[in-house]
Structure formats: structure tokens, C-alpha cells
């Protein structure tokens, strides 16, 4: 039995969230009656309203009137008035991943998982399949620039989704193709131990049916170890590793992107094949690896080399993934979602490859618990930045932790050998600080998952206002 057409209205609590908004949009495009609520106005809320979805700002019991089902994310607390009202009225309550799983049952599905790179890789897979006239349905964790949204309903038989592992519910997703980009210690508030994180990714791959396949990056030692533990499933490995089934070769920086080729070796057939002259308009080895994952999926699904080559060269990127927000006196301002040490190091390496001048990092640490648990890693991931400007921790709903704050982080960076670390008093001070250190040719990279994105977009204008 599949999701019946007559069900509805479907009420989303926290509909403006990036994951929730994509599911709501696809359901609406399928013809279901969708409504919802969110704590505040946002671009996602406005976009969904334009599609005719009724959205209330603020959470109250009256909002769920007439709803047949309630969809909630893990961010919704158990004492949320809409959730309490639904349970009192015995209205079914489903988690976001469960509703996504229902949508996935309507198509053949590709699910992209990993601690980092999920959103970009999902977007790349979607772009390649689009170019191959597959016309996929897409539900992503970020705004795809080519679509202007994070979701679209396609007429084809395939669906491409970002599989969020943060609460373990990605194990509910019925994927025919699973991609694992990397596995690092993250979301330990849910998993408790890194061993539990690795077990979850192993189960994610083993859940793929016998007629499907997994694409896994063996450049990452934890993923390579997982490959060795998975039995009875077809796995295509990728990376620069000489043992990879899809091997990244001849990677070179080229302007604001990179060029490379991919060599395929089929273990069963004993054949080899190369896709040459590939160009990706995004900098950084990490993005080239994401592209190889997408290419491996597209190649396995039968897309031609020429289609892959053209689609990759035309890839428009994802919002908040090395996004240029403007310039000032020859200084380039970049906004990036990177908030984990591995992501930050990769983004700064990409920035270093993009300019021969200075790289200035502006970081807003995201969550006290993350800064605490990965403090050593945070103190050593800014090596490619000439200057680090440190803002206050963005709490994301967490209570402060004694000794885990901006000033402690600044001291940690200095103690680990960083030459220039500047504490930022507040966002209003940012333009003045940047103007004091940035010169023509420099890159200013704003990093974080909090409201620093607003600073990044405001910064070019604020710098110009200084004269």
C-alpha cells in the first residue's frame, strides 16, 4: 500500500526547515493538500506560500485544524502545542524521514549520505540525470541554484534525495542506490559513540536491495573500512586511491574550478574506461571527489560520457556552498555552510587554490557541544587561512557551556600556532575588521551554519559604505 491520494491536509510543523520544505513542496506538486507552521518568516516559507501552501507563523494548537496527518522534524520538541494537540486528537504523527520514505516508494531512488558533501553531491547527481533526460524528482538539503529551490517534481522514474544521518532516521529510506561520501565523528548527541555512527552507515548500505548498488569513497579510511565489512551487496568505490573502481586522475586547479578525468575499472568484466576532459566550475579537491561520486552513479545508470562532460561543466552549484556574495576593492566575499572542522579545512583549501593573495576566514562556531567535542580539530583546521576572525558561538538552541566560547577558541587557535586570530565583538563590527586586514585579491570566507550567511550577504555593501 502506498500513500493514498485522498489523504490530507498534511500539516508540517516547522515547514520552513530545509528538509521539511522540500518534502512539502513535492507533496504539493503531486496534488496533495499541504499546510504548515513555522517559528518565523523565511525565504522557504515565502516560496511555499507562493505555491499556495497555507502557513502560520508561530506554533499553536489551532493551526492543525482539519489535518489528517502531522509531519515533524527532530527539531520539534515533545511539548510543542501542535504535536500535543495532534496526539490528543489521535491524528497520526510521522517524522520527516518517514514521509520522505513514503515519497521514495513512488520511484526508484538514489540516496546520498555522508558527514560532508551530501548536498553538493545530491545536486550534482540531479544535474547529470537532468542532462541525460532522466527528469528526476529531487529533494535536497540546500537550494540548487539551477532550480532556485531545494526540491522539484520530475516526470521520470528516478528520485534523488539527500539522506540526513543526524538522527539515525536515514535508515528508514528505501534506496536502490546508496552513496557514502565520508564518515566522521558528528551528531554524537544522538549516536553517543563513533562506533554507532559507523554501524548506522553500514546498515544504510546493507539496506540496498540486491539489484541496487552503493557508491563509496575509499579515500576516506573509515569508509574503506566499512567497505570491508559489507557483504553481499554490489559496491562501486571511488576516489584518488589506486584501488578505486572510479578513480580521480590528473586533478588540476583551473580558474574558479578544476579539471580532471575519471578512470573506471570493472572488476567483474575486467574492462577499463576513461572519461576525459572533465571540467567542474567549483574549486577544491573535495568538490572534485563529490563530482566523481555523481559521475559514478550517472555512468552506472547508462549516461553517455558526453552528457556527463557537458552537464558537469554547466553545473550551477548550491547556495551556501562556496557562494560569492560580492566584491569590495578587489576583495572577494564568500559564504559557506562549513561548520565541521573537515568541511572548514576543505573550504579554506579551495579558497587557497583560488587566489595567490590572502585568505581571511570569518567563523561563527555552531553549537557549544560541537565546539567542545571537536575542540582540538577546530584549533587545527584553519591552517590555510592567513587571518581568522572569530565570532561568538551560535547556540542553535543549546545552553552555554562554561569555558566553551569565542575567547576560549581564540586562545586555542593561538596556542596551536595560528599567527593572526581576531575576536569579533559583534556582527556590526565585521566590516571594520575586514577593511583593516583585507587587500585587493584577498578572499574573505564566512563559515558557519548559523546566521553568519546574513553577514556574508550584507558585508559587501557595508564595506562600500565605509568608503
From Swiss-Prot:
Q: Where in the cell is it found?
A: Cytoplasm
Q: Which UniProt keywords apply?
A: ATP-binding, Cell cycle, Cell division, Cell shape, Cell wall biogenesis/degradation, Cytoplasm, Ligase, Nucleotide-binding, Peptidoglycan synthesis
Organism domain of life: Bacteria
Query: Any signal peptide, and if so, which residues?
Result: none
Q: Which GO terms describe its biological process?
A: cell division; cell wall organization; peptidoglycan biosynthetic process; regulation of cell shape
Q: Spell out the InterPro entries in the cross-references.
A: Mur-like_cat_sf, Mur_ligase_C, Mur_ligase_C_dom_sf, Mur_ligase_cen, Mur_ligase_N, MurCDEF_pg_biosynth, UDP-N-AcMur_Ala_ligase_MurC
Give the catalysed reaction(s), semicolon-separated.
Answer: UDP-N-acetyl-alpha-D-muramate + L-alanine + ATP = UDP-N-acetyl-alpha-D-muramoyl-L-alanine + ADP + phosphate + H(+)
Which residues of this UniProt protein bind ATP?
114-120
List membrane-spanning regions. Answer: none
Q: Does the keyword Nucleotide-binding apply?
A: yes
Tell me which PANTHER family the record gives: UDP-N-ACETYLMURAMATE--L-ALANINE LIGASE, UDP-N-ACETYLMURAMATE--L-ALANINE LIGASE-RELATED
Query: What does this protein's UniProt record list under function?
Result: Cell wall formation.
Record's protein name: UDP-N-acetylmuramate--L-alanine ligase
Identify the species of origin: Rhodopseudomonas palustris (strain BisB5)
Amino acid at each position: 500500500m502506498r500513500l493514498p491520494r485522498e489523504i490530507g491536509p498534511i500539516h508540517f510543523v516547522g515547514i520552513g526547515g530545509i528538509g521539511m520544505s522540500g518534502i512539502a513542496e513535492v507533496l504539493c506538486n503531486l496534488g496533495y493538500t499541504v499546510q504548515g507552521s513555522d517559528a518565523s518568516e523565511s525565504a522557504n516559507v515565502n516560496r511555499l506560500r507562493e505555491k499556495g501552501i497555507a502557513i502560520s507563523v508561530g506554533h499553536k494548537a489551532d493551526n492543525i485544524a482539519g489535518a489528517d496527518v502531522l509531519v515533524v522534524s527532530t527539531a520539534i520538541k515533545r511539548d510543542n502545542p501542535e504535536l500535543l494537540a495532534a496526539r490528543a486528537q489521535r491524528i497520526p504523527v510521522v517524522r520527516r524521514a518517514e514521509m520522505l520514505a513514503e515519497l521514495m516508494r513512488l520511484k526508484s531512488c538514489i540516496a546520498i549520505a555522508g558527514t560532508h558533501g551530501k548536498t553538493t553531491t545530491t545536486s550534482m547527481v540531479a544535474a547529470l540525470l537532468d542532462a541525460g533526460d532522466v527528469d528526476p524528482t529531487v529533494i535536497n538539503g540546500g537550494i540548487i541554484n539551477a532550480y532556485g529551490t531545494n526540491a522539484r517534481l520530475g516526470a521520470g522514474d528516478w528520485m534523488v534525495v539527500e539522506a540526513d544521518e543526524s538522527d539515525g532516521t536515514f535508515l528508514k529510506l528505501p534506496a536502490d542506490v546508496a552513496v557514502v561520501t565520508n564518515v566522521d565523528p558528528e551528531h554524537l548527541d544522538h549516536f553517543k559513540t563513533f562506533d554507532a555512527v559507523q554501524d548506522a552507515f553500514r546498515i544504510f548500505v546493507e539496506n540496498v536491495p540486491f539489484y541496487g548498488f552503493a557508491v563509496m569513497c575509499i579515500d576516506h579510511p573509515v569508509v574503506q573500512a566499512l567497505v570491508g565489512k559489507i557483504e553481499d551487496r554490489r559496491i562501486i568505490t571511488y576516489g584518488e586511491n589506486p584501488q578505486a573502481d572510479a578513480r580521480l586522475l590528473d586533478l588540476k586547479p583551473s580558474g574558479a574550478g578544476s579539471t580532471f578525468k575519471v578512470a573506471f575499472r570493472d572488476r567483474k568484466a575486467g574492462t577499463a574506461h576513461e572519461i576525459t576532459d572533465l571540467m567542474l566550475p567549483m574549486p577544491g579537491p573535495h568538490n572534485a571527489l563529490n563530482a566523481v561520486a555523481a559521475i559514478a552513479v550517472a555512468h552506472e545508470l547508462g549516461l553517455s560520457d558526453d552528457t556527463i562532460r557537458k552537464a558537469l561543466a554547466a553545473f550551477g552549484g548550491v547556495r551556501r556552498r562556496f557562494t560569492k556574495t560580492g566584491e569590495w576593492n578587489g576583495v572577494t566575499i564568500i559564504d559557506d555552510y562549513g561548520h565541521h572542522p573537515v568541511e572548514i579545512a576543505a573550504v579554506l583549501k579551495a579558497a587557497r587554490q583560488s587566489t595567490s593573495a590572502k585568505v581571511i576566514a570569518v567563523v561563527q562556531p555552531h553549537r557549544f557541544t560541537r565546539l567542545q567535542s571537536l575542540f582540538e580539530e577546530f584549533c587545527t583546521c584553519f591552517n590555510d587561512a592567513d587571518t581568522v576572525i572569530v565570532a561568538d558561538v551560535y547556540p542553535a538552541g543549546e545552553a552555554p557551556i562554561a569555558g566553551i566560547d569565542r575567547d576560549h577558541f581564540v586562545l586555542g587557535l593561538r596556542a596551536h600556532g595560528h599567527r593572526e586570530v581576531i575576536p569579533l565583538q559583534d556582527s556590526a563590527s565585521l566590516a571594520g575588521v575586514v577593511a583593516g586586514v583585507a587587500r585587493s585579491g584577498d578572499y574573505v570566507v564566512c563559515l558557519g551554519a548559523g546566521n553568519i550567511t546574513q553577514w556574508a550577504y550584507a558585508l559587501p555593501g557595508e564595506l562600500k559604505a565605509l568608503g
